[in-house]
Design a protein with these regions (language model features):
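Blade-level signature of beta-propeller repeat domains, shared across WD40, Kelch, NHL, RCC1
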Residues: 290-291
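Catalytic cores of extracellular degradative/oxidative enzymes
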Residues: 1-279, 284-285
Length: 291
């Protein structure tokens, strides 16, 4: 799946919980494949990855969420594999590709969404992927320039008109400073389920343990607590992203919210089709043996 739904992460977290060697082997294979094969290492797209492909590199969306260092951190820190370390170094300045390649050029063209910033991105999955790259470079080398870039982003997001709900999805960004801006209607709001299902949630939570920016923490907690309701209000989104509400419930010590998050894992949202969770046995001659 080219890391599209954070499969590397859930494999590694599963290994850390269980210690199972079969999970280790799968996580290792995924890490090596997605880090070495699904990412461009030379050429105009170097530092980015390609997703949604039937064949490799077929998708026009060359994005940081595929190449981000977050996928490789587990394997590197558990093995000190230097090749893996090189792959993380490769992407430390991948945000500079935004000068030439706008991830929202088709979905939200500049002609329709005013922006005089030198580049554009989404808070997630784009900025969170870049921030994970910077966090990794900072912790591996001690280069505080990358830490400062994260801080600039956190502080600028915290003062946006609607913080993490600020619309449109494509916001102004300056790769030289790390500052995020908007020039659109300050009343415009948006939600994006992709923000926190592609490694962004885990990276943000780890960053907040390393960098204490109260206004960012407040913005992140507010987004987690209100995401489900806001997503339904704005677009009738069926993606509830239950871990956001669970996170908010824990930090707010809100039992009712915790119960709702747990319930959401097993029930469907009103007005949406029920998930087709059915177990079907397929028998020969359709398959060689029962499946």
């Amino acid at each position: 799946d080219n890391t599209e739904l954070a499969s590397n992460m859930w494999l590694w977290y599963n290994f850390l919980r269980t210690g199972r060697i079969d999970i280790w082997r799968m996580a290792e294979a995924m890490t090596r494949h997605t880090g070495e094969v699904d990412v461009y290492h030379i050429g105009p797209n170097a530092g980015l990855g390609s997703r949604h492909n039937v064949s490799h590199w077929g998708c026009g969306a060359k994005e940081a969420r595929i190449s981000q260092a977050a996928w490789n951190r587990f394997y590197y820190y558990l093995t000190t594999d230097e090749r893996c370390g090189d792959l993380m170094t490769e992407v430390k300045d991948a945000d500079h590709k935004l000068y030439d390649l706008d991830p929202m050029r088709l979905a939200q063209p500049r002609s329709e969404y005013p922006c005089t910033a030198p580049a554009r991105l989404r808070i997630g999955p784009d900025w969170l992927a870049y921030a994970g790259n910077w966090m990794t470079e900072w912790e591996r080398t001690g280069n505080t320039a990358y830490r400062d870039k994260i801080i600039a982003g956190m502080k600028s997001i915290a003062v946006l008109p609607n913080r993490l709900f600020t619309g449109p999805k494509a916001l102004g960004f300056d790769p030289s400073t790390g500052i995020i801006t908007t020039e659109c209607d300050p009343k415009l709001e948006t939600t994006n389920h992709l923000m926190t299902i592609m490694g962004g949630f885990e990276i943000a939570n780890e960053m907040m343990r390393m960098i204490d920016i109260p206004e960012w923490k407040d913005a992140w907690l507010d987004h987690a607590a209100r995401y489900k309701k806001k997503a339904w209000e704005l677009s009738h989104s069926r993606f509830r992203v239950s871990h956001l509400m669970a996170y908010a419930a824990y930090h707010l010590r809100n039992t009712q919210m915790a119960e709702e998050a747990w319930k959401d894992l097993f029930t469907r949202l009103e007005h949406t089709p029920a998930p087709p969770f059915r177990i079907t046995t397929i028998l020969p001659p359709e398959v060689p043996s029962p499946l």
